[in-house]
């Protein structure tokens, strides 16, 4: 059983907004392993940028649960069937969200921007429930200017473009997490640092293996652009920001050269419908292989100030454009 409502001061719900969820008219369902199930539509009036809570009662939970640990959000767990309750004073706080794959809002904004990628989009370093990811700051900026546009974040920490990591590769999930989102008009793709980093972490590389990886990444980005254009979605690329200060990847000169080579390719005209040069925005001019101190968290991820800078640099006029379906 499940219900949806607007979240009040946590962990409470706005009782007046509590609505039951059904699945093909039934309150209960069985979801097969690795499958997903959409609920029937439900009418609920929500203010812009409201928090939405989904209550789930599991009669029998799976041995291994689906979870987005890097959601930068909290969940609350209680024993028994409490889907009709609006408060749970005895709830146990859990980091991340569990079992829930998406919430689809059937509004009709002029622009729907889906931002996807790895932990930088996922918001590494952002305190839970604080909404300080770069996409959160961009959403507030759009709202403050009265823009008829919304932002959807489908980043997954540890994600890679080509191969599965902490979740499926972006190439594999691009349809589900970007192109299939309701009303999507634009998408931002910021990914590749884990592809480069994992390729050399704890292993030897050769000029041939590095060249092969770059060619694979270029082909992967080109395929995303082709798939987006086939659906009339404007694809916005993004350069990879520097990470020489990362203790996790500890990149050497060869890895930095690969990042520079990939960024040069990403910057070439025609690769995307627009480009965000986050490398130029956040790098240290005196040490271009590293992030500037004021926007650096851990040598790999931006700080909260860095996320704000990314949002402030986004060219809002891009969202006024429309991209014709490629034939």
Feature locations, PLM:
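N-terminal secretory targeting modules
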Residues: 1-116, 126-129, 320-327
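Solvent-exposed loop/turn segments at secondary-structure junctions
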Residues: 61, 119-123, 156-161, 193-197, ...
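Serine-esterase "nucleophile elbow" of acetyl-processing enzymes
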Residues: 85-157, 162, 166-167, 171-183, ...
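Catalytic His-Asp segment of secreted/periplasmic serine-dependent ester chemistry enzymes
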Residues: 171, 199, 240-327
